[in-house]
């Protein structure tokens, strides 16, 4: 995923501020060395408790896929495996999540909103 690093990870919490197509968000940098400000490609993971119907809900119509300023994510469902692992597609990125609970009726291409998470980013191809 292409992002613009606005502020490097200076503190022990390794929080960086990034700009995406959808706005500015604070995320956790997981690279070995702090990133330099500027445009870069990253991979991301979503961390936190994920439950269908609580943290993973249908997105309102008209939403665009991507990282939101509030730290949530909107993504298109790319598939759900028999073990419950869901593949979510955002511009330039596919993220795997394993929400618990009863899966609502969703289809490939439907948008979901994932809230109450922390987003970790890594340098691409690490």
Label each PLM-derived region with a short phrase.
Residues 20-34, 90-108, 115-120:
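Beta-strand/loop nucleic-acid-binding surfaces
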Residues 28, 52-54, 85, 98, ...:
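Short acidic, gly/pro-rich beta-turn/loop elements at beta-sheet edges
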Residues 15-17, 41-43, 74-76, 87, ...:
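Beta-strand secondary-structure signal
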Residues 13-58:
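Acidic (E/D-rich), amphipathic helical modules within compact regulatory domains
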Residues 53-69, 124-126:
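Short, compositionally biased
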Residues 1-11, 61-83, 111-114:
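Structural detector for short beta-strands of small beta-barrel domains
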Residues 9-12, 17-24, 79-97:
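OB-fold (S1/OB) nucleic-acid-binding surfaces
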Residues 4-6, 37-50, 107-125:
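Flexible glycine-rich surface loops and low-complexity tracts that mediate binding to linear polymers
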């Amino acid at each position: 995923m292409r992002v613009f690093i606005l502020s490097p990870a200076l503190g022990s919490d390794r929080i960086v501020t990034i700009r995406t197509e959808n706005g500015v968000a604070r995320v956790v940098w997981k690279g070995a060395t702090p990133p330099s400000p500027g445009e870069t490609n990253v991979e991301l993971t979503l961390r936190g408790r994920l439950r269908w119907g609580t943290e993973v809900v249908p997105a309102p119509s008209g939403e665009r896929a991507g990282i939101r300023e509030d730290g949530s994510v909107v993504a298109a469902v790319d598939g759900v495996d028999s073990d419950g692992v869901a593949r979510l597609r955002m511009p330039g990125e596919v993220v795997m999540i394993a929400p618990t609970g009863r899966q609502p009726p969703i289809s490939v291409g439907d948008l979901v909103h994932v809230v109450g998470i922390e987003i970790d980013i890594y340098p691409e191809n690490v």
